[in-house]
Amino acid sequence: MMEELHSLDPRRQELLEARFTGVGVSKGPLNSESSNQSLCSVGSLSDKEVETPEKKQNDQRNRKRKAEPYDTSQGKGTPRGHKISDYFERRAEQPLYGLDGSAAKEASEEQSALPTLMSVMLAKPRLDTEQLAPRGAGLCFTFVSAQQNSPSSTGSGNTEHSCSSQKQISIQHRQTQSDLTIEKISALENSKNSDLEKKEGRIDDLLRANCDLRRQIDEQQKMLEKYKERLNRCVTMSKKLLIEKSKQEKMACRDKSMQDRLRLGHFTTVRHGASFTEQWTDGYAFQNLIKQQERINSQREEIERQRKMLAKRKPPAMGQAPPATNEQKQRKSKTNGAENETLTLAEYHEQEEIFKLRLGHLKKEEAEIQAELERLERVRNLHIRELKRIHNEDNSQFKDHPTLNDRYLLLHLLGRGGFSEVYKAFDLTEQRYVAVKIHQLNKNWRDEKKENYHKHACREYRIHKELDHPRIVKLYDYFSLDTDSFCTVLEYCEGNDLDFYLKQHKLMSEKEARSIIMQIVNALKYLNEIKPPIIHYDLKPGNILLVNGTACGEIKITDFGLSKIMDDDSYNSVDGMELTSQGAGTYWYLPPECFVVGKEPPKISNKVDVWSVGVIFYQCLYGRKPFGHNQSQQDILQENTILKATEVQFPPKPVVTPEAKAFIRRCLAYRKEDRIDVQQLACDPYLLPHIRKSVSTSSPAGAAIASTSGASNNSSSN
């Protein structure tokens, strides 16, 4: 409908307004038929056209109507032309009730047509402001006056009904009116248009920004793909170079091992009855040293024999006359031409001095050979260890540099235990060297035993994963390979463990040993400060790693497989916790309470680790274990060696300070009630050099303690 109104020409709009206002148009002849048709086309909302005064048929009136007074051919307009009131008059003449269905329907359609038409005309935004504003203000009143001025063609009975119709039309028309003026509407339109332009501009900007961002995302995505491809190439090249380097190192190790087999020795298989055993055969280096020792021994024996003969030819002392028998013997020897005649005193001393010098030289040479022999023994230990490592590596299923978990490239075998292998590996993700411990279960085990071992390893992983201390080896990762094997990824340390160092060097200085003990105690203090606290239970030189392979560097503690968690359910601050794994561990480093057999399991606490610290410190200082040094674990268990270790004995050499001996005694107290715990161990004066010096120099109590400890040390050493 709005499109039809907009399509009218100005002349027809003026004619339409004249019909609403009742004012004639003097600008030319008016075609009433066309104007009525246009009005009906605009005002009709239903499919049935509204009846006009020309078309309506009055069934009630049978009289003839006058001819149309308005003649379009004459070109003049008369006041008897059809007005808008005629449409309302038709509506007023039809009663609201008592009509048939078609009449009621036509009345309802005519009633709804006019307000709709008026609302459409008022809402038309493009009408001229000067023409529409004054006319639109009086539309309502024009309808009422037009109805009053029109001649009534009905009786007085229809007057009230027509008035009610006029009121209804007037009310409906007022309800469709608005308080907004054309100026306000135009202002709102302008503001809306400006807002719309701003929004459209903002939308355009956002679209351009979105396009730019999409373009940048595409560029970054392409760059990311490019970098990923480059990274993959770098990783592939790194793997290739690492494998080549590992192969070269393996070849070099095997060449060196083959050379050392001739120089240091090798294992040979010897048959004993129905069984075969491996027997060690020394190489030519040891054989040469043994020959030199045999030569030195034979020369020493010869010198001793000559010294005895020289003693027989020793001249008598001054003032003593030789006996007659000696003279007769000398004569006989001279007559016989023998050379063992009596020497003069000067000749005797000269010959004696020569023999002494020769013996001294042989002794020095023997010491050098002994030192060389000890050095070769240390090298032989390395050689034997390398032979075993190469043998285990050649028989391993992981010898061909596999990549485990798509991340860890195995390089070479570090060592092998009962059910595990430790490989040096490279982490391709973090770009660092790691130690991968591969746990392999025996396929012949029962499922229950496999589950128990796996549960034990998971427990170790959970304990170790939460630890974060510079003196404890870090655990990075844990994953399964198959149903019978899984891996743990640990921090890699270049050096060896303390046990290997002691086998190579026997012992170390007190300063170096104290430095190692201080670091161990620092780690134990951390284990007892976390919640819940942890007992390591398996402290020994084999579980203490030397980072750079020397005794004057950093250490790290590893292997938490036997650790005990002191949670609230199992640990009592007075009695400790029950030892559920009695018989496990390394017996040389366990305290006596771990070997007590009774109806109930023994109670342990962190004092177990304190005892282990004392044993390790003693072994570092003296090169031997304080209890059961040359015994096996089975002998220690059968002979109750640790249960009998009520007091520690110190050898006279090497020389150790009284403070170190007192510290060892505090750690190796037989009764656990008399032994210090980890917290007291961390505050021990011996491990704090500045406090120890100040106490020994300024405090009389410290001097008294030092004197008593020195006296006790003297008494024990005596």
UniProtKB/Swiss-Prot annotation:
EC number(s) reported in the record: 2.7.11.1
Cofactor: Mg(2+)
Keyword annotations: ATP-binding, Cell cycle, Chromatin regulator, Coiled coil, Cytoplasm, Cytoskeleton, Developmental protein, Differentiation, DNA damage, Kinase, Nucleotide-binding, Nucleus, Phosphoprotein, Serine/threonine-protein kinase, Spermatogenesis, Transferase
BP terms from Gene Ontology: cell differentiation; chromatin organization; chromosome segregation; DNA damage response; intracellular signal transduction; negative regulation of proteasomal ubiquitin-dependent protein catabolic process; peptidyl-serine phosphorylation; protein phosphorylation
Enzyme class: transferase
UniProt entry tagged with the keyword Repressor: no
Active site: 538
Localisation per UniProt entry: Nucleus; Nucleus, Nucleoplasm; Cytoplasm, Perinuclear region; Cytoplasm, Cytoskeleton
Region of interest called Disordered, as start-end residue ranges on this chain: 24-85, 147-176, 310-337
Post-translational modification: Phosphorylated at Ser-696, probably by CHEK1. Autophosphorylated; phosphorylation promotes the assembly of higher order oligomers and enzymatic activity.
Region (Required for interaction with TLK1 and DYNLL1/LC8) location: 193-244
Residue ranges of coiled coil: 193-244, 285-315, 349-397
Gene Ontology molecular function: ATP binding; protein serine kinase activity; protein serine/threonine kinase activity; transmembrane transporter binding
Gene3D superfamilies: Transferase(Phosphotransferase) domain 1 (1.10.510.10)
UniProt feature, compositional bias: Polar residues: 29-44
Catalytic reaction annotation: L-seryl-[protein] + ATP = O-phospho-L-seryl-[protein] + ADP + H(+); L-threonyl-[protein] + ATP = O-phospho-L-threonyl-[protein] + ADP + H(+)
Residue numbers carrying Phosphoserine: 73, 102, 696
Basic and acidic residues composition bias: residue spans: 46-61
CDD domains named in the record: STKc_TLK2
Domain of life per record: Eukaryota
Free-text tissue specificity from the UniProt record: Ubiquitously expressed in all tissues examined, with high levels in heart and testis, in particular the pachytene spermatocytes and in round spermatids. Some evidence for the existence of a testis-specific isoform suggesting a role in spermatogenesis.
Regulation of this protein's activity per its record: Cell cycle-regulated, with maximal activity in the S-phase. Rapidly and transiently inhibited by phosphorylation following the generation of DNA double-stranded breaks during S-phase, probably by CHEK1, possibly at Ser-696. This inhibition is cell cycle checkpoint- and ATM-dependent.
Presence of keyword Thylakoid: no
Record's subunit section: Monomer. May form homodimers; homodimerization may enhance autophosphoylation and enzymatic activity. Heterodimer with TLK1. Interacts with YWHAZ; association with 14-3-3 proteins such as YWHAZ regulates subcellular location. May also interact with FEZ1/LZTS1 and FEZ2. Interacts with CHD7 and CHD8. Interacts with DYNLL1/LC8.
Purpose: Serine/threonine-protein kinase involved in the process of chromatin assembly and probably also DNA replication, transcription, repair, and chromosome segregation. Phosphorylates the chromatin assembly factors ASF1A and ASF1B. Phosphorylation of ASF1A prevents its proteasome-mediated degradation, thereby enhancing chromatin assembly. Negative regulator of amino acid starvation-induced autophagy. Testis-specific isoforms may play a role in spermatogenesis. Highly expressed in embryos throughout development.
Protein name listed in UniProt: Serine/threonine-protein kinase tousled-like 2
Source species taxonomy: Eukaryota, Metazoa, Chordata, Craniata, Vertebrata
